[in-house]
Structure formats: structure tokens, C-alpha cells
């Protein structure tokens, strides 16, 4: 059994590739079924966010394993293998465990130490358990990563300052508009990222927020919290002209806001500027919108400069966190090695118990037939000793014949011989 982590993220691939490799929530079950149908895959978890798509797998070693998994990923998303290979990373066993712990702890995020990723990792794990999870080692790896992430946040200052993609989007808005209290903000979506954006905006005294979402119920809960109006996605076209700032983050596979829609809104606004921050993958706003005069479009990749400004205060904490991850990875791998030996131990114990039961049954039968008890017990002890030491004796003899002193010493140590 081998543990693997493979995928792409914001550091290795542009948003144009990340959106093509992402797994939409409504097709995740189908993707997991297809993945687990691969003969080498014992268990799998798919993590797909704005900034990364990763597969965490428990697999049987085989020739061309990497080729087979890359081919599956490319076939599933209809990708050119060469395009994917340039951006794909591949971690195995110790490195896979360490990578997951770093991801869950926010150490591999666009925003160092951001807490949202832990919730996303947990959701990916829960989704994988709905009839898909098969490998206990993979399950244990995820459970361990959750406890490590909690330890990192408790024992370091990695989350001391409020920095996230949502926070960066709000920072960008504050840089462009002198005061947010007089602007109208349209939020598209009602997921976790938009929730964070809405709360940040409320803290900065935004008076008018409109939330457009596919389902009204979820949007209404957030709207009640931040004092916003709720509209349907179909109403965006007619209401877009009211918005000075549009921040969008949905799971839609196709753009929601097109160039024509923004052109009409700008005309109605007499070309007053609009800021559009698209933090969705795949993108919610057509890239061509950025070519329009007075439409200022930013993607998740464009937020990098803002986010970079906030990294300094977290770097010292990250060093401490990396030490924790290294320690916890080492402990987990020790547990994993012990698990791999446990089946051998069970087999060895079962074999010894079988010999014991077989010889004891024969001895008891001999006693019932009136045999001499002392002779029967001596015979039992002799046969039991010979049967139990037969295999170790053969191994010692073979090691001696081969002149393999290292193996001989290992066997001596295993048998408790000084």
C-alpha cells in the first residue's frame, strides 16, 4: 500500500488550467466512483477549491502507476497530458502525509495560514466517505491532518491576523474606493468565501449589499446577518448597474457575468467605474470584461500582490508550524510502518496458536486414553519447542550459509539472543 498526493495549485498552474481541472460539487460522486474503479486505487479523496485540485489516494504499487493516474485525470477532464504534466506535482508516502498536513494547516495556501482551507479539506474527506472511502490508512491520514491543523493554530500565531482571499478582495476594494460606506456591493454566491467577504464589508461600514444566489434560502441567512438584499441569479442583468463593486464566488461551471451584461450596466451608469473581483474557479466573469473601459476586473491570481504584503507577519509562525508538521509526519509514518507489520504479527501469532492447539489436542487425547502423564507432557514440550523454532532455525542456517552477517544479527536480535 502506498499513499499518494497529486495535483495542481496556484503556485504551479494559472487559473485557466485550474478551472479546467476542477471538480464541480454536483459531479464529485461520479468522479470518485470513476477514480475508485481504477484497479490500483484502494481509496481516494478529491480536494477541489479555487486554488487547488488534488487527489489523495491509497494505491497498490504497480508499473506505470504515475502514467495511469495522469491518464485518468486527463481523460476525465479531456485535457492534453503535456499541459497537465508541466503543472502537476506528485508526493508519495512521507511526502504525501506532510503535504496534506501542510495544506490543512494553511501552510500551502495562497494566503499563508488562512483557516478556510481546513473546512474545505474536512468537507472533501466527508464527501469521500459517502460510500467511497475504502482505505483505513487514508482515513487515518486525514484525521491526523485535522488534529495537526488544530495544533498549529493553537500553538503558533499563524492565524493571528485576519488574512484571506476574502480579506484581500475587501482590501482591494478599499484601495480603489476612498470610502466603502457610500458604495453598493453586489455579492454573487453565498458560500463560505462570500460569507467572509460580507462580514469584512460590514465591518468597513458598507451600507448597501445585494446578494445574488441560486438558492434564496442560504442567501437569506447571510443577508439577515449583514443587512443585505437577496436577488436571484437571473436578476443580475437588470441590477448590475446599481453595483460599484461586484465580488463573485460560485461553483458555476460557466460564467455568470458576461461582457455584454457589463457593457449594458456601464452604459446605464454613464460609464462610472465598476470593480469586479472574480474569486471563483472556474471563473464567474468572462475574461473579456477586463478589456472594457471603466470595468476593472481582478481574478484570484491578481490578488497575489495584496496577499504577499501580509505574509511577513506570518513567516515566523510558519517556521514553528513546519516543525510541528515534520514531527507529526514522523509519528504518523511510524504508526503506518507498525500497521504494515501488524498483519505479519497476526499471521505469526495465529500460526503459533495453531501449533499449540494442534499439539495440545493430541496430548489431551493421549491422556484420556490412559497414557503416562509425565511422558505425554515431555513429548508435548519437545514437539512444541521443535515446531516453534523450526522456521527461525532454518533462517539462521541460511543466513550463516550465505555469509549474511547483517541478517544474522537481525535474526539474533529478533529472537532475543545476546
Swiss-Prot record:
The active site is at residue 50. It catalyses: (S)-4-amino-5-oxopentanoate + tRNA(Glu) + NADP(+) = L-glutamyl-tRNA(Glu) + NADPH + H(+). Possesses an unusual extended V-shaped dimeric structure with each monomer consisting of three distinct domains arranged along a curved 'spinal' alpha-helix. The N-terminal catalytic domain specifically recognizes the glutamate moiety of the substrate. The second domain is the NADPH-binding domain, and the third C-terminal domain is responsible for dimerization. Homodimer. During catalysis, the active site Cys acts as a nucleophile attacking the alpha-carbonyl group of tRNA-bound glutamate with the formation of a thioester intermediate between enzyme and glutamate, and the concomitant release of tRNA(Glu). The thioester intermediate is finally reduced by direct hydride transfer from NADPH, to form the product GSA. PANTHER family: GLUTAMYL-TRNA REDUCTASE. Belongs to the glutamyl-tRNA reductase family. This is Glutamyl-tRNA reductase. It comes from Shigella flexneri. The gene is hemA.
Amino acid at each position: 500500500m502506498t499513499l499518494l498526493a497529486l495535483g495542481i495549485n496556484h503556485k504551479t498552474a494559472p487559473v485557466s488550467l485550474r478551472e479546467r481541472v476542477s471538480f464541480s460539487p454536483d459531479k464529485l460522486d461520479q468522479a470518485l466512483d470513476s477514480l475508485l474503479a481504477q484497479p490500483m486505487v484502494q481509496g481516494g479523496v478529491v480536494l477541489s477549491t479555487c486554488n487547488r485540485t488534488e487527489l489523495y489516494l491509497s494505491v497498490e504499487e504497480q508499473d506505470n502507476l504515475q502514467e495511469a493516474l495522469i491518464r485518468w485525470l486527463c481523460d476525465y477532464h479531456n485535457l492534453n497530458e503535456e499541459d497537465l504534466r508541466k503543472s502537476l506535482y506528485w508526493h508519495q508516502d512521507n511526502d504525501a502525509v506532510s503535504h496534506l498536513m501542510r495544506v490543512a494547516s494553511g501552510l500551502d495556501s495562497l494566503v499563508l495560514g488562512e483557516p478556510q482551507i481546513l473546512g474545505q479539506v474536512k468537507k472533501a474527506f466527508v464527501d469521500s466517505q459517502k460510500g467511497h472511502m475504502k482505505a483505513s490508512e487514508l482515513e487515518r491520514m486525514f484525521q491526523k491532518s485535522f488534529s495537526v491543523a488544530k495544533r498549529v493554530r493553537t500553538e503558533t500565531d499563524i492565524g493571528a491576523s485576519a488574512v484571506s482571499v476574502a480579506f484581500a478582495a475587501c482590501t482591494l476594494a478599499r484601495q480603489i474606493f476612498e470610502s466603502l460606506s457610500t458604495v453598493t456591493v453586489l455579492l454573487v454566491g453565498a458560500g463560505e468565501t462570500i460569507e467572509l467577504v460580507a462580514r469584512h464589508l460590514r465591518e468597513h461600514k458598507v451600507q448597501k449589499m445585494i446578494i445574488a444566489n441560486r438558492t434564496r434560502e442560504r442567501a437569506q441567512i447571510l443577508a439577515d446577518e449583514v443587512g443585505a438584499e437577496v436577488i436571484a441569479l437571473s436578476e443580475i442583468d437588470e441590477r448590475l448597474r446599481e453595483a460599484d463593486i461586484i465580488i463573485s464566488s460560485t461553483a458555476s461551471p460557466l460564467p455568470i457575468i458576461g461582457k455584454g451584461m457589463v457593457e449594458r450596466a456601464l452604459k446605464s451608469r454613464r460609464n462610472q467605474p465598476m470593480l469586479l473581483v472574480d474569486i471563483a474557479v472556474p471563473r464567474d466573469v468572462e475574461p473579456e470584461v477586463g478589456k472594457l473601459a471603466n470595468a476593472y476586473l481582478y481574478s484570484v491570481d491578481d490578488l497575489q500582490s495584496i496577499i504577499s504584503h501580509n505574509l511577513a507577519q506570518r513567516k515566523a509562525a510558519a517556521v514553528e508550524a513546519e516543525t510541528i508538521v515534520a514531527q507529526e509526519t514522523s509519528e504518523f509514518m511510524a504508526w503506518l510502518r507498525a500497521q504494515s507489520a501488524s498483519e505479519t504479527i497476526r499471521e505469526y501469532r495465529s500460526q503459533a496458536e495453531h501449533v499449540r492447539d494442534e499439539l495440545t489436542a493430541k496430548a489431551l487425547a493421549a491422556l484420556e486414553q490412559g497414557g503416562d502423564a509425565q511422558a505425554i507432557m515431555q513429548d508435548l514440550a519437545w514437539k512444541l519447542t521443535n515446531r516453534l523454532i523450526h522456521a527461525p532455525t532454518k533462517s539462521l542456517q541460511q543466513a550463516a550459509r550465505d555469509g549474511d552477517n547483517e541478517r544474522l544479527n537481525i535474526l539474533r536480535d529478533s529472537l532475543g539472543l545476546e
